[in-house]
C-alpha cells in the first residue's frame, strides 16, 4: 500500500496536492492498487465508486494448472454489468456537476488487466484467425544473460512455453484486444460527457497505463520485464494550449505527469517530486529532453531508455543493450560489443546509485522497490 511505503511517508499524492491547492478531488476505480485508505482517505472529496466485475462460476478458457487470474472469454453478457462501464458512467455524470472550484478527477479502469472477461460484442470486433502475432525467433533469448529469468519470470503468468503448449496465444491475444476495445469505449463515454459539459474548454486530459504488456514478445507474457513491451505505455495529453495530433518522440516517465500538471495548472512547485515537467514538449514536441526514461524492477535492476537506445543492467552486473533505430523488437543484445562501449557508458551515467531494499507490504503479492532518482554521474 502507498501509505506503508517508507519512502512515501511525507509525499502527498497528486490528489492531495491539488486538494491542498483548492481543487475539488474526485476518484474512482483502480487509481491506487488498494484504493485511498488509511491516511489517504481524506485526499478524495467525492468517490466515483470502486466495484468488481462479475466472474463466471467456472473457468472459460484457462488450463487447469494456470493461475485463477489467467482466464478469459465472453463474460458477462452486457456492458452494464462491468465495473469499468459503471465507473465511466459515474464519471460522466459527475462532469455535469457544478463544483464551484477547479476539479481534479482520476479514473482508473481495470481492463485490460487479467482476467480478460468482457462482453461478447467486443470479441466480435476481431477475427481471431486474421490478426498478426508478434515475431518471435526461437533464438531470441540466446544472447541474454543466464539469469535474466530471475526478474522476468513473473510467477502469476504462464510461461510462453505453456501458452504455446496449450495453443492459447491467439485466443489470449484476441481477449486482450477485446478488452482494450471495451475500455476504449469507456474512455469515450467520459470524453463525450466532457464535450457536452461546462468544463469542455478548460480541462486538461491525460491518458496513460501503469505498465505495458507482453503478448508473447521475447517469449514472455504479462509484465515485470525491463524490455520495451513491459516498460512502454501510451501517454496522451489534450486540452487548452496543446496542439492536437502532434507526437513527441522524446523519452518520458510516468513520474513526469505529476510535475507537468502542477506546472500547467500554475500551482506552486512540489519539491518532493523527482519527475521532470513535460510542459516544454507539450508546447513544442521537438524540444529535446536531457533525461532518459529510467525504469526499475525489484531492487538493483534498472533500464535506461533514450530516443534510440535501451540499456538494461541487472543487480549482478549482467547487461543488455539495444539499438531501437535498427532493432525495435530488441532481438539483438549488443552489450559487451567494443564498438558500442561509448554509447553504453553514456547511458550508464544515469543508473541509480542507490536502491532501497525491496519492500513487502501486508501481503506477499504487495511488493515495491524504491530508488533515489538518478542524475548523470
Per-region residue spans from a language model:
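Formylglycine-dependent sulfatase
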Residues: 1-314, 318-319, 328-355, 359-363, ...
Amino acid at each position: 500500500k502507498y501509505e506503508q511505503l517508507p519512502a512515501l511517508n511525507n509525499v502527498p499524492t497528486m490528489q492531495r496536492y491539488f486538494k491542498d491547492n483548492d481543487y475539488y478531488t474526485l476518484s474512482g476505480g483502480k487509481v491506487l492498487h488498494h484504493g485511498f485508505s488509511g491516511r489517504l482517505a481524506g485526499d478524495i472529496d467525492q468517490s466515483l465508486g470502486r466495484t468488481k466485475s462479475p466472474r463466471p462460476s467456472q473457468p472459460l478458457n484457462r488450463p487447469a494448472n494456470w493461475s485463477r487470474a489467467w482466464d478469459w472469454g465472453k463474460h458477462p453478457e452486457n456492458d452494464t454489468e462491468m465495473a469499468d462501464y459503471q465507473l465511466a458512467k459515474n464519471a460522466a455524470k459527475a462532469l455535469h456537476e457544478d463544483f464551484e472550484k477547479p476539479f481534479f478527477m482520476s479514473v482508473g479502469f481495470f481492463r485490460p488487466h487479467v482476467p480478460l472477461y468482457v462482453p461478447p460484442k467486443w470479441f466480435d470486433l476481431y477475427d481471431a484467425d486474421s490478426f498478426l502475432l508478434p515475431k518471435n525467433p526461437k533464438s531470441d533469448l540466446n544472447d541474454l544473460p543466464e539469469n535474466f529469468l530471475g526478474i522476468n519470470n513473473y510467477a502469476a503468468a504462464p510461461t510462453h512455453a505453456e501458452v504455446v503448449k496449450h495453443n492459447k496465444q491467439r485466443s489470449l491475444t484476441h481477449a486482450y484486444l477485446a478488452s482494450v476495445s471495451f475500455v476504449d469505449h469507456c474512455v469515450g463515454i467520459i470524453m463525450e460527457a466532457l464535450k457536452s459539459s461546462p468544463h469542455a474548454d478548460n480541462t486538461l486530459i491525460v491518458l496513460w497505463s501503469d505498465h505495458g504488456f507482453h503478448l508473447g514478445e521475447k517469449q514472455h507474457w504479462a509484465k515485470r520485464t525491463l524490455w520495451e513491451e513491459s516498460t512502454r505505455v501510451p501517454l496522451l495529453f489534450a486540452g487548452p494550449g496543446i496542439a492536437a495530433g502532434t507526437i513527441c518522440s522524446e523519452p518520458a516517465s510516468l513520474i513526469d505527469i505529476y510535475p507537468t500538471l502542477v506546472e500547467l495548472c500554475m500551482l506552486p512547485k512540489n519539491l518532493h517530486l523527482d519527475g521532470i515537467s513535460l510542459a516544454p514538449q507539450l508546447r513544442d514536441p521537438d524540444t529535446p529532453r536531457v533525461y532518459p526514461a529510467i525504469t526499475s524492477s525489484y531492487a538493483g535492476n534498472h533500464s535506461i531508455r533514450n530516443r534510440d537506445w535501451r540499456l538494461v543492467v541487472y543487480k549482478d552486473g549482467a547487461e543488455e543493450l539495444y539499438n531501437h533505430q535498427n532493432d525495435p523488437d530488441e532481438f539483438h543484445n549488443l552489450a559487451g560489443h567494443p564498438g558500442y562501449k561509448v554509447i553504453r557508458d553514456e547511458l550508464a551515467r544515469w543508473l541509480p546509485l542507490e536502491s532501497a531494499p525491496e519492500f513487502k507490504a501486508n501481503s506477499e503479492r504487495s511488493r515495491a522497490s524504491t530508488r533515489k532518482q538518478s542524475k548523470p554521474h
